[in-house]
Regions:
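Post-transcriptional modification and biogenesis factors for structured RNAs
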Residues: 1-186
Length: 186
């Protein structure tokens, strides 16, 4: 048996894993290419090297593979230049994660980091403003202009961000909730 699903589609493919480096994500250097179906030309899967308003998603200790996959899809949908994951985040190559990315895993570069605060400091040295999602953020998300280089820091489903990680952020933002909803599940 080669599938982990009950009713596989009967299709098998081999895909090379690409291992990105943080430096590639920050510099926008091509780490890989794909062919644009419309033009037939090879294009970088990391994006425009000259892009000034870079956007990153930093996630800490995400446990559910489906949630991580959803974050990849959301990252691609908003034009994220990369996703940075703490070393205790679920395996990006978990079959459920891969399925839930709906292919975004092949188009959005990503790295794992052993030192999330150290990585945040590297981003800050590269003039990237770090916004931490926090239930008790100092301001609501719509109080800021995100047109500059930005990274959004999202914590784990059950505990949110660790205090020391949240303290590394430049700003803490909240998303107002209606009703009795407390968070957006990561």
């Amino acid at each position: 048996k080669m599938s982990d699903t009950k009713t596989p589609q009967g299709i098998l493919t081999l895909v090379r894993q690409y291992h990105y480096r943080l430096e590639e994500l920050l510099a926008g250097k091509p780490g890989g290419t794909c062919v644009d179906k419309r033009t037939g030309r090879a294009v970088s899967i990391i994006g425009d090297v000259h892009k000034k308003n870079r956007l990153y998603l930093i996630v800490e200790d995400i446990q559910d593979p489906g949630n991580l996959g959803t974050m990849f899809r959301t990252g691609e949908a908003v034009g994220a230049d990369g996703i940075i994951m703490s070393s205790h985040t679920v395996d990006v190559y978990n079959p459920k994660t891969i399925r839930s990315t709906m292919g975004s895993i092949y188009r959005v570069p990503f790295v794992y980091t052993e030192d999330i605060c150290g990585t945040i400091h590297i981003l800050q040295k590269n003039n990237i403003c770090i916004y931490a999602a926090d239930l008790h953020g100092e301001k609501e998300y719509d109080a800021y202009d995100y047109r500059g280089a930005s990274a959004f820091l999202i914590g784990n489903e059950g505990n949110g961000l660790r205090k020391e990680t949240a303290a590394c952020a430049d700003r803490r933002i909240s998303i107002p909730m209606e009703g009795s909803v407390e968070s957006l599940n990561a």
